[in-house]
């Protein structure tokens, strides 16, 4: 209900203001917010520190873009097919990665991501290499929706974003979600209570990959293309940045983190080309000063002992 | 309000909700500074997305410098009935999605009516998609990838290109190299270009035209260092192993310098004739501490080619103002901005459609023209008749001598043929 | 001999759980005191608190003129306290001689009585094993090595945590002999033990710890006669 | 894929020699950077993601020192010392605060420094790429060895790297400092209880790792142009080396670096368009089969 | 009387060290047994072997006559062996009620449900029951990480109880506690046992507690069974006394 309300409210505010920059900002926020939330399913809720989450963002974007460009006539069908492919990828990569513990898990996810990145760069005939998918992504009408119209793209993105948040939240609030937290908090104890820990790690990996890919699909729609840096390690790093900024212990923390990250990025690039310097300093202050995300701090203050 | 079941609110508690809202409101206010802008005598805003940080930062910086010089001259001369041009350059960090965002922001947020795109190719394609959607007038000033304006699927009526093209360079390079191959008996050719689309296109098209102009040559191998590779040892040894008589490379900037430094160690350039299309650009020429004599190169930018007074003056003015010599990207952006300024003056308008109409087929006088002028070809909205030439390096200024200028009638003929083959013309 | 240890009312916690409850313990220089108690009574924690590894939340650790509580372990070691942990903690991939070399340092007054050669003199078996990786020594040899490693730091006070645990009787005898020798050299030793009879043999005084508190203190002779105390705190 | 060329090279002595020596050279430069990463991880348990940035700093410091003194030796020493000191400060002021935190915190502190240092270099030295040029002593013709070509500068580089590897191995294996460092890697608390200031020890190890990165940047400066952001690709490659060799093993890093160098030099013949993919593929395979690396905790 | 849980000839090596050396023990249904022994006697290893956290090198673990040795930990838990740990092993970010509900759902294999809200009503009711049983009702909504040490130990036991186990293994339930807290927790444990008559095995160092509540005692030393019997028998067993006071010197002592 609340998600629906927030969704309608967002759309109303946006249409009332009718401001294109606001719409752009909100769309990017929805994309990166969803991406960060999906990463946080792993990092925050399951305790799996993936260095390679952008792999799914990039894969989703490319799969969708390529399907649309190579003649799938229905946009929802292409999106669903891309999601299915991404889930299959996540299943395979995840099954291999979760066998490893701690830092080795992280490294293996990174290695797989860089492998995908290398494939995207090398397979020029399919992916366009470093120049990305060119010529735009066709947007045939479906169900009366015309995604060639920016406003309708915005509406669809917003609806998908809130629906995804609702879905992720439902999952995280379900017995399944609590099982993931058990794995995060104390995997050996969870096993001693009869929980098949590895299976749950894998399921979390696939779900996170799925929503990461969905964010990638939205991104492909937004920029009307797909680029290798969608699957580059820097985007994985920025995902971490976002969730650390906003807070990994609170559901909406990553969304806030994404919002701050984007606003900071957009504002700083307006005034200086030394964007990295500013972002680096902010990151240092958050990590060394607060030692947790903003919403984590707020929640820690609010919670009675 | 939804509870977790044990009385602990987890989602949408008032605290977090208001934080989120505050963020949105802050975002909205930050994003709309133009709301308060006055209406009279407002400047004509031109947005320039470019790479100002990271390994390609000098691309953006020289682009910005050159465009700013033209803008300043226009404003100093009184602008358009007192209306000045404001150039807003913004960093995309070389990421295509960020370039798309910056362009949207420049258009929607900063009220730019015109986009001067100073992105590398991948960014340019992203910018192209944005301006296709918004209909904003756009000139790409740095992307050399031919398909951007040649491929009917990709080009857009409101988007122009004011930059050299891989195809043009390849035709010229092929014909120049064919002449030398014939004279010196260079039969075995090899390529060493960066492993990305520009490098691959450049190598294959160069070889195509080389073979067309001199059928006796054969390509005996190719090696593909990756972009920004620190190390070229394996490529150098690969070339030595293959023992070609001549080598073509589309490496540029720091990568080309590293390649030359590392090739020198093996005495590579004593053993093969080296055709480096991107050698003749000042930072590259200066950065190579021991520039081998006898490297064949196309001009990227040289103040001595075309050997005209106006070219030398422009170069000197740039050097004086920025204390650095101009690069290839500088002349392209200077010219692009000149096209815009002349279109504005000619039409007295800042309307994109009107300006686009004026730009199509426009010819301007320019130090960078092969014969003193450059034309924005109407059919595919890209420039022709700019100066292209090949020469040979010498270790000291002016670094390149024996420049042979290209013949644009040959280029035009071959280009038409090529487009027909592709089904684009 | 002026240096003496005085532990005053220390409380030690591991996270939420309190292990020591106001432990007091004083000893004079040149004395051998045994801290006796069952598994989990708090002996090791007391030692870790003194050595700075588990800093006390409350209380003081006076050593000579200084309060060591809260100092990092290396400062406490340099103040003249040599620590031999209960599970020995040799550096397993290092040779015996390297283990000793890592422990080498002058004492707090700059004395360098204990060197590799004096240690080998006292413990000739270590000389024989000097090139062997410490991880491949037997339990008794490892115990000798950790004591020797602590001696290499020329301490004024030696903390020996359960030196006989899990060792064969013949090895226990060797350690006993070593302690007698150290006593004649004037070394101050605080010893943690579960083994009553070992304590009676080597210690001047015995302090009994139970459930994180000091419950009894007496001379070794008197305590060995006290069946009630023995049954209550030590036997089953 | 070009398997004919690959087979052709394998059957030609001069090709084998040239490509093997090329692989060695690539491997040596990789090792120089990777050994710092592996040293810092082996002792401190910290993955130094800022190591590539240290390498960049080394290259720039060397460039400036060379311009000022015209002495390559001074340039290398200056870069090594400068970056080493920077590493010590970085450890004491920033990293030491997150030693006890999770990997994520450490990663983010390093990431912050990658961003900051890239921009700092741009501010100080400018955005244009710069090249040091070959010092006159090394501007010699390449040597011919059994039909293969080997440049003298690379002979020097290989010699220096092998010397550094041996010195580092000796330092870690033979000296008291090395013994203490190895002991601290196993049991920091016990080392501390023996009177050794482990904070200082950690800082010095971090400084040593940084010094090696600085030296690597300086040693590579004559043949690699310097630009802001140049550390990234080196960082990724040295991570592959570190992971394949086994985190913490100097010998492992050396072996893996040579292995990777050979993969690159022969891969450029057999699979010219996918050498990057080959390296990541190798990393994936090693992680799957032997996650602790080929030489888990070998000599360090 | 057949044993509820029986261990036959169990062996476990770690490297060259024998941690469990041909141990044979049995525990009758509804018995309350203490396992004692010096450090390193193999008590915790024994628990790990029973619950399948580590695999035995040889021997059998018989639950109601069926061999469960070598099964996965989750499979063994499913057969009704619950376990609490020496250092309370909890889910720090869960409230007490959430911890228990999660444990119940995990045990009932209902954690795969993604669309229902946690906790299911049935689990919640059962969680309330268990909370009441161990007396943690008042702390239902406090986070596990914020509980006192004693309450953390209780919660750890409650997690095991939530599985409604036939056999409950408690590893040092009183470790790290003050005098009064110890007795509180031990009273709770004893009350649970007498109310529910499950087979309960606990490791303990506090002999006062052992002798007060245990029906029978097993003594381990160096991975072997040294003695077994009633508290009174153990108290007077010379070998046991010697093991604690030092073997070589036991006879020499006056």
Kindly label every feature range from the protein language model.
Chain B
Residues 65-87, 212-215:
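Signal peptide-proximal N-terminal region
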Residues 47-66, 90-96, 119-120, 192-201, ...:
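Extracytoplasmic "Venus flytrap"
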Residues 106, 110-119, 139-141, 190-192, ...:
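Periplasmic-binding protein-like
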Residues 98-101, 146-147, 156-265, 304-313:
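Extracellular/periplasmic Venus flytrap/periplasmic-binding protein
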Residues 1-18, 22, 27-29:
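N-terminal secretory signal peptides
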Residues 58-65, 80-150, 162, 224-233, ...:
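Beta-alpha junction/loop-to-helix N-cap segments that form part of ligand/metal-binding clefts
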Residues 156, 263-334, 345-348, 405-424:
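Extracellular/periplasmic periplasmic-binding protein-like sensory domains
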Residues 293, 363-425:
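Solvent-exposed, acidic/polar segments of extracytosolic/periplasmic ligand-binding ectodomains
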